[in-house]
């Protein structure tokens, strides 16, 4: 917990300093001094000193494969606190590791600390001018190289500690706000994806019934463990875009219900149904998944 607490403290200090400097610049065009422009993401660094131990757990998460140093930049550590603790506790318990927390070399882009864009629009300062004074968004840094395995284990130092670093996460969090019109924190850890309007309508009706005053659902469930329903009937490219952004939230599970999720009139529950896999001709995933895989 001390490591996560320090991540939160460093992140808060950096974002507060960036907001303060940005506010001052909008007021009187005073740029931040060199001593006050270290607006950096915190970094979580873990060194694995292999002592020959063989962890008994067969879990697919919270484990390291080879001795060495692993690192990742972190954003919004308070919001991701539970996730971070769930990963770090078993790592520190089952492996001989050293955990360090400190500022990284990656700057926080100024758009990621501005909650409302109106204050920028009313200031008369252009985005191009702000980008010359403050760290700005670098889309080349927000990539899926780690998640897609597009890196060399032998030459990478440090090794990636997580699938998504701070730049990639912040980019997707802002996209979720843009696409949904609501806070990204509203997305629940259980996600249901579908491209059929009738499924959406049915789940909405079911959800409204569950929210009735006398519902057993409300009596036995925590408000933080809900379901988010996403209609992805917007084409394969947009559907991939949606899931790319949702992935940084590290949901417990997501499930897609397409055409094969429904029963025909001639079928009953218990019948064996073979789902059809389509041969991909859209080219959306060809870069990360061989085209011969359905």
PLM region spans:
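Accessory terminal and edge-of-domain segments that mediate assembly/interaction
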Residues: 1-253, 262-294
